[in-house]
Regions:
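Conserved alpha-helical substructure of the radical SAM core
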Residues: 1-104, 108
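Flexible loop residues that form catalytic
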Residues: 29, 62, 114, 181, ...
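Radical SAM enzyme [4Fe-4S]-AdoMet core and its adjacent flexible, acidic
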Residues: 32, 103-104, 108, 112-273
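Conserved phosphate-coordination/catalytic loops
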Residues: 36-40, 127-131, 292
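Residue-level signal for the nucleotide or nucleotide-sugar donor/cofactor binding architecture
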Residues: 37, 68, 128, 156-159, ...
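Short Fe-S-cluster ligation motifs
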Residues: 45-61, 326-364
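Accessory C-terminal segments flanking Radical SAM cores
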Residues: 222-336
Length: 364
């Protein structure tokens, strides 16, 4: 099969975070601060990524602003020729800090938002943060950077989609991504409390369609579909090892952010291998690349080139076998597993609350 070079790099600079969101998709076992790559090592990663064909990097976490050397990291990515986007909660962003990052080559910012009401936002995030987000939005807009909001949708905020769109307009965002929760990592522990009902999703989808028509090009609305409810498997990262790669805080390189959950994958690390070998030859990246690994019904399905068999991590989480068809797909032999979850979400369940993300005291 023909394999193209990657064009995007998700750089997870740290797992440390001031928020404790119950929908966090980072792994249960987080990388400690002492095990993180140094700024110099990140600079080498960016140089290798650019040489491989990568053109943009998302500087993420955790909260990347907790890295004191973030200005040096941004400058290194820019020097390597990569387009840089900061993915942040906004907590800790100040005018001088943002000015330093922009001077170093920061090109755009994505700011997370949990709700439009401060009390609801902070209940979801598990920390006081709404005022910091509002202040960060103002700073980003004043700096003239391309500015997007990201709202992870779940049972506690999906009914506020209309208000979230209004918030994006009020804060001056160019784009808002309304991303239904991906049930990986900590979010998987909270799936029962987080999963919205079919009716909630239908209402939210209708709101997005209506607002798209009304707003036109004034605000880009991105709706990340809820595969559990739609019956359509999500195309895993555009295909396993097809368009992007993730480097975790300790240098582990993954085809997708959740892939470390798969048993036997043995993901490589930039401390031991170069990115070009990792991309082209490592067993972790070739494991589910293409179609040769597929079993029926995926192997003979007309959608196999569209959804790539769905999410390997979700297939493993739900069935215990990463090679099975993603149960989110309505054609999957295990689709009843997902239907049962969705049907349960539609029943009155009282005031279920999610468990906030927990961190070890000696580090994240």
């Amino acid at each position: 099969m023909t394999v193209d070079p990657p064009w995007a790099l998700l750089a997870e600079l740290t797992h440390a975070c001031p928020l404790r969101c119950g929908y966090c998709s980072n792994p249960i076992e987080l990388v400690s601060r002492s095990a993180e790559l140094t700024g110099e090592q990140w600079a080498d990663v960016f140089d290798q990524a650019a040489g491989l064909g990568v053109v943009q990097t998302h500087l993420s976490g955790g909260e990347p602003l907790l890295r004191r050397d973030l200005p040096q990291i941004v400058r290194a990515a820019d020097t390597a020729g990569l387009y840089t986007q900061l993915v942040t909660s906004g907590v800790g962003l100040t005018e001088p800090r943002l000015a330093t990052l922009v001077a170093g080559g920061l090109r755009s910012v994505q700011l997370s938002v949990q709700h439009t009401r401060p009390d609801a936002s902070e209940r979801i995030a598990g920390a006081r943060s709404f005022a910091a987000k509002e202040r960060a939005a103002r700073l980003i807009r004043t700096a003239g950077l391309p500015f997007g909001l990201n709202a992870v949708l779940h049972r506690a905020n999906i009914d506020a989609v209309d208000e979230l769109i209004d918030l994006a307009l009020a804060w001056g965002a160019d784009r808002i991504e309304l991303a239904n929760t991906q049930f990986h990592g900590w979010a998987l522990r909270n799936r029962t409390a987080l999963l919205p009902s079919h009716d909630q999703i239908a209402r939210a989808r209708a709101v997005v369609a209506r607002r798209r028509e009304l707003l036109g090009k004034l605000l880009e609305l991105v709706w990340v579909a809820p595969d559990h409810v739609d019956g359509t498997a999500k195309p895993c990262m555009g295909g396993w090892g097809a368009v992007s790669l993730t480097v975790a805080p300790d240098g582990t390189v993954l085809p997708c952010p959740a892939a470390a959950s798969l048993p036997g994958l043995d993901p490589p690390n930039v401390r031991a291998h170069r990115l070009d070998w990792i991309w082209w030859h490592s067993p972790a990246f070739t494991a589910y690349r293409g179609e040769s690994w597929m079993r029926d019904p995926c192997r003979g399905c007309a959608l196999r080139g569209v959804d790539h068999g769905g999410c390997r991590c979700q297939a493993y989480a739900l069935t215990g076998d990463a090679t099975r068809t993603d149960p989110a797909c309505r054609l999957a032999p295990d689709h009843a597993l997902v239907r049962n979850l969705v049907d349960r979400a539609a029943k009155p369940r009282g005031d279920l609350t999610h468990v906030h993300r927990a961190y070890r005291e000696e580090g994240p």
